[in-house]
Amino acid sequence: FTGHLAADLFWSLRNPSQVRWGDFVNAAVEAGIAALPIVGLVSFLIGVILSFQAAIGMMQFGATSFVGPLAALGIVREMGPLITAILLAGRSSAAFAAEIGTMTVNSEVDALVTGGLSPIRFLVVPRVLAGILVMPILTLYADIVSILASMFTMLAYGIPFINFYNGMVAAVSLEDILSGLVKATLFGVVVSAVGCLRGMQTGTGAAAVGISATRAVVSSIVMIVLVDGVFAVISYKTGSVSYTHLTLPTKA
C-alpha cells in the first residue's frame, strides 16, 4: 500500500489534470473547514491549561515571566501539531475509513479494479492530498488560538500582553514554526493514509465498517505518536531543539 501510494502521489504531481479534484475539495472541506470549531475550542483550552499549569510551577521560583515563552514554544513545536492531528484522527481518519469501507462492502472497490482503475489513485490520492493541505493550515490556526489563550491567562498573573509578546518573539524562531508545520504535514499524510488503508481492509458483515473506523482512529493515533517520537529524536540529534536562547522578558 505504501509503495503504491507513494508512486501514485508522484503520478498526481506529473498529471494534475487527472486527479479527482472534486473528491479532493470535498475531503478538504470536511477535514479542514468543518474541523475549525472543534480545533479552535480544544486549542483554546490547551493554551489556558498549559500556561496555567506552567505558571503554578514557575511562581515557586519567581519566574512567571518565563511562562509565556515556554508555553509558546511548547504550543508551536509540540501541542499544536499533536492535538490537531489527534482531532483529525478522530474525525477525518474515521470518516475516510467509513466511506471507503462502505464502498468495499458494496464491492465498488472491486468494480474499480475490474474496470482497470487503481483504487489508490482513484480514492486514496485525493484524500491524502487533502490531508497534506489542511493539516498545516489547521495547525497554524491552532497555534494562534492557543497562544492567544495563553496571553489572556497570563493577565491573571499580572503579565501584560506586550511582555508576553516580547518574550514569545525572543523565544520562538522561524525554525520552530517551520518544524511544527513540517511535522503537521507528516501527520496529515499519516491520518489520511491510515484511514484509507483501514477502509480498504474492511471485511464483510454489518459491523465491518464500524470496526474499520475504530481501527483507523487507533492506528492513526499510534502512528502519530510514533512519528512525533522519531521527529523529536531527529530534532535532538541534529541540534535543532535548544532553549539556550531564552532570556527573561523585561517589564514594559
Protein language model regions, located:
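Hydrophobic alpha-helical transmembrane segments that constitute the membrane-spanning cores
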Residues: 45-49, 85, 125-154, 194, ...
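Conserved small/polar residues in nucleotide/adenosyl-binding loops
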Residues: 244-250
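Loop-to-helix entry region at the N-terminal start of transmembrane alpha-helices
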Residues: 30, 34, 38, 63-96, ...
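Final/C-terminal transmembrane alpha-helix of multipass membrane proteins
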Residues: 217-232
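Start (N-cap) of specific transmembrane helices in multi-pass transporter permeases
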Residues: 27-30, 107, 118-139, 216
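Short cytoplasmic-facing helical segments at TM-TM junctions of multi-pass membrane proteins
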Residues: 99-125, 209
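Membrane-interfacial helix-loop-helix connectors in multipass membrane proteins
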Residues: 52-77, 144-185, 189, 194-215, ...
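Core alpha-helical transmembrane segments of integral membrane proteins
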Residues: 1-84
